Design a protein with these regions (language model features):
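A helix-coil-helix interface module used to build multimeric assemblies
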Residues: 1-212, 224-231, 292, 304-306, ...
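Charged, flexible cofactor/metal-binding loops and thiol motifs
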Residues: 127-135, 141-142, 150, 157, ...
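C-terminal catalytic subdomain
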Residues: 312-322, 333-413
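Intrinsically disordered or highly flexible coil/loop and linker segments, enriched in small
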Residues: 47-51, 110, 158-161, 241-242, ...
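Long, low-complexity hydrophobic alpha-helices enriched in A/L/V/I and glycine
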Residues: 163-166, 240-243, 380
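Long, intrinsically disordered low-complexity tandem-repeat segments
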Residues: 465-483
């Protein structure tokens, strides 16, 4: 009689960012991947002519792997495994593979049983299963991340010329544009996406001590044993390993680092949205969700909050993977390997949720251009004080310039009252949109175009197109007075 399944501890009650997005890393999918890894080993033996082909066909049939087109969620080949019994039995050996092998052998014909798990060690199967899980999950992560990046890039181009205040150390610094800020989000996401695309998902097959000795005996030759890991990887839908990685854990740490970078990039987006959406700033707002239980007037940045919750947790999880890798002693690790499993799964889980929420956030984000321009004028023209310094210090000296900025009253009127600035177009020099530098060019992806001799010319062309050279550096002596330092 089947045992009672284990009580579900975590359905997302305390992890709303992952709710509805973590099926691909659930225990069911991990179990599915474990079974697929065991079946892939039998298939690899058959591909090399070591095991009869009919054995591989029969094993695939028993566990449903010959049914094409069915999603793992609907057609888990592990559906006949007593999960409760498996979980309970996993404690004794420290991993689920040991009891799983016995359960799988019970389901196949007697002549197939010797080929289940033959020559492999538990780590071969579990590492391979985690790579299967990771590859599936990362396809979804990549899809959602790409959408978020594309939407951020669209925002950048749409608002390339819309002026805003750049803030450094929380304070207004110089003018920028809304688009330049969105381009920063897009570049971070695109860099993370490139890292995801570069990932490898190698299978693991090296035997008990990483020497493949058992496979030499089983296959009858060093050549067959050397070819077996690649055949195993093909059958599992993974990359061929270049060598055993039982204790060289780069596939795990590189995957973890890519996930942390993804969540870093999304965390930056979410942090900016949460800050810029404050009532007193109001430059952006989320287009979905965000109600308050006690204050109906509030529109909480719920998407940004959820994304930030994931981003704040990710670095510590990534650090755990590196710590485990550094403590992967001998030829098989004791405990460090085990620490990776839930850590990697949680990173994948957070990335699945955060990327989906980021795609929604970027797709529905509303920009209040008027609020951004209004905020840029809050300091009464002092947002362009960097520019003013280059213009006025040669005329009135640094002490008087400092007094001018520190004084009360309308800055434009104070400038017009200066005899030394009689020929100055005050409105033009105080216009923040006339001192955005290359922000529109950056927003339109100028910095991301192909490198080469044409980049400077393109920058100059874009600057001229947007009127950025109307009051150029030479006219006001900005470089001479160190404004660009």
């Amino acid at each position: 009689m089947p045992s009672e399944p284990p009580t579900v501890v975590d359905v997302g009650l305390l992890s709303p960012v992952t709710v509805g997005h973590d099926l691909l890393v659930s225990d069911g999918f991990v179990l599915d991947a474990l079974v697929r890894a065991e079946c892939a080993l039998v298939a690899a033996y058959a591909d090399l002519g070591v095991a009869p082909r009919r054995v591989a066909v029969e094993v695939d049939h028993v566990f449903g792997l010959d049914e094409r087109g069915g999603s793992p969620a609907r057609n888990l080949p592990a559906r006949n495994v007593d999960v409760g019994a498996l979980v309970a039995a996993s404690v004794a050996g420290g991993n689920p593979v040991i009891p799983l092998v016995g359960m799988l052998k019970e389901q196949v014909p007697a002549d197939c049983r010797p080929w289940i798990h033959r020559g492999a060690t538990s780590q071969d199967i579990l590492d391979t299963a985690l790579m299967i899980v990771a590859r599936r999950a990362m396809e979804q992560v990549r899809s959602s991340l790409r959408i978020a990046g594309e939407r951020a890039r669209e925002l950048a181009v749409t608002h390339a010329d819309d002026v805003a205040a750049a803030r450094t150390l929380t304070q207004h610094a110089v003018p920028t544009t809304v688009g330049a800020r969105a381009a920063t989000w897009a570049r971070g996401i695109e860099r993370a996406l490139a890292r995801v695309d570069a990932l490898a998902y190698p299978a693991q097959l090296a035997g008990a001590g990483g020497t493949l000795a058992s496979f030499v005996e089983i296959t009858g030759s060093h050549e067959n044993a050397a070819a077996l890991p690649a055949a195993f990887a093909r059958a599992a839908g993974l990359d061929a390993p270049d060598a055993p990685w039982h204790v060289t854990r780069w596939p795990i740490t590189e995957l973890g680092d890519a996930l942390v970078q993804v969540l870093d990039a999304l965390g930056k987006l979410a942090a900016d949205v949460a800050t810029l959406g404050r009532t007193e700033i109001g430059e952006v707002s989320e287009g979905v969700g965000g109600g308050s239980s006690a204050m109906p007037q509030k529109q909480n940045p719920a998407e940004a909050v959820l994304i930030r919750s994931a981003a704040l947790r990710a670095p510590q999880l990534g650090a755990t993977l590196h710590l485990a890798a550094s403590l992967a002693i001998d030829e098989r690790p004791d405990g460090a390997w085990h620490a990776e499993w839930p850590t990697l799964r949680e990173l994948l889980r957070l990335a699945l949720g955060a990327t989906r929420h980021a795609a929604l956030l970027a797709s529905h984000l509303r920009v209040d251009v008027a609020a951004a321009r209004r905020n840029a004028g809050l300091t009464g023209g002092r947002l362009v004080s960097e520019r003013l310094r280059g213009v006025l210090v040669p005329l009135i000296g640094a002490p008087r310039f400092a007094e001018l900025l520190a004084g009360d009253g309308d800055l434009a009127e104070r400038l017009r009252a200066l005899p030394e600035a009689a020929g100055l177009d005050v409105d033009a020099v105080l216009d923040p949109s006339a001192y955005v530098g290359l922000a529109p060019w950056l927003a339109r992806g100028g910095a991301d175009r192909e490198a080469g001799g044409g980049r400077a010319e393109r920058a100059a062309s874009d600057a001229h197109e947007h009127g950025l050279d109307e009051h150029g550096p030479d006219e006001h002596g900005l470089h001479e007075h160190g404004v660009d330092e």
